[in-house]
Amino acid sequence: MSQLKPQEIVRLGDIQMANHLPFVLFGGMNVLESKDLAFEIAETYVDICKRLEIPYVFKASFDKANRSSLHSFRGPGLEKGIEWLGEIKKHFNVPIITDVHEPYQAAPVAEVADIIQLPAFLSRQTDLVEAMAKTQAIINIKKAQFLSPREMNHILNKCLEAGNDKLILCERGTSFGYNNLVVDMLGFDTMKEMNVPVFFDVTHALQTPGGRADSAGGRRAQITTLARAGMATGLAGLFLEAHPDPEKAKCDGPCALRLSQLEPFLAQLKELDALVKGFKKLDTH
């Protein structure tokens, strides 16, 4: 077993991520559809987060490797995707988070991304976990839809034994029968007991996997309800995807917040986060 322990507060420049601190936003778009659209979305997030004083990290994927159909849009790929993300990082002076799907991608992605993300479906893949951990980048570990919150401790231990203690856990829903996900609110406390920052991916928790003929469906209309519920548990951060025209988004449009609603949505969550974290803790054991 590793002598390392996870960092309770994960630091990224001036950004501090911890369950007792003001929430951090991992926000952007699902997949890099085009360079122009990525810049448009990044600019909107950056401007709004500056106004609301929300610490911010831009998120987008360069490849969606688990699409329902062979013909579904996947993104620009590793080389071009890293290039675009690097340009966004430099232009807006904003940190970057993106996901890694295969071990060989970990090192080149970590040269640009400040946080590398372990996809939920791949979270038990030991070779991938080890390759990501060895980059020494911050790792955002998505909780698999088929794993309990407590089982995430095994993945944390893999990272620690590979020498990386800069770890984040991220809830994104649990499979509930066919074509449905639910969020166990008690699971947030279970993961927080592991002394790591815990985030909530409200976007993908709204999925109805396989809910359409050749793609996932979603429940955008319930995003405010679910986001409020999750953030009321007192979390380190929120993971969110938005799009100027979700009906035309090339991936997970039914789950994406309308970009025009981003500011009022985040303003409500900032107010709720401050309220919850201002409460005196009660020991109900």
Swiss-Prot record:
The gene is kdsA. HAMAP family: KDO8P_synth. PANTHER family: PHOSPHO-2-DEHYDRO-3-DEOXYHEPTONATE ALDOLASE. Its EC number is 2.5.1.55. GO terms for molecular function: 3-deoxy-8-phosphooctulonate synthase activity. GO terms for cellular component: cytoplasm. This is 2-dehydro-3-deoxyphosphooctonate aldolase. Keywords: Cytoplasm, Lipopolysaccharide biosynthesis, Transferase. Pathway: Carbohydrate biosynthesis; 3-deoxy-D-manno-octulosonate biosynthesis; 3-deoxy-D-manno-octulosonate from D-ribulose 5-phosphate: step 2/3; Bacterial outer membrane biogenesis; lipopolysaccharide biosynthesis. The lineage of its organism: Bacteria, Pseudomonadati, Pseudomonadota, Gammaproteobacteria, Moraxellales. Belongs to the KdsA family. It catalyses: D-arabinose 5-phosphate + phosphoenolpyruvate + H2O = 3-deoxy-alpha-D-manno-2-octulosonate-8-phosphate + phosphate. It comes from the Bacteria. Signal peptide: none annotated. Its main location: cytoplasm. InterPro entries: Aldolase_TIM, DAHP1/KDSA, KDO8P_synthase. It comes from Acinetobacter baylyi (strain ATCC 33305 / BD413 / ADP1). It is found in: Cytoplasm.
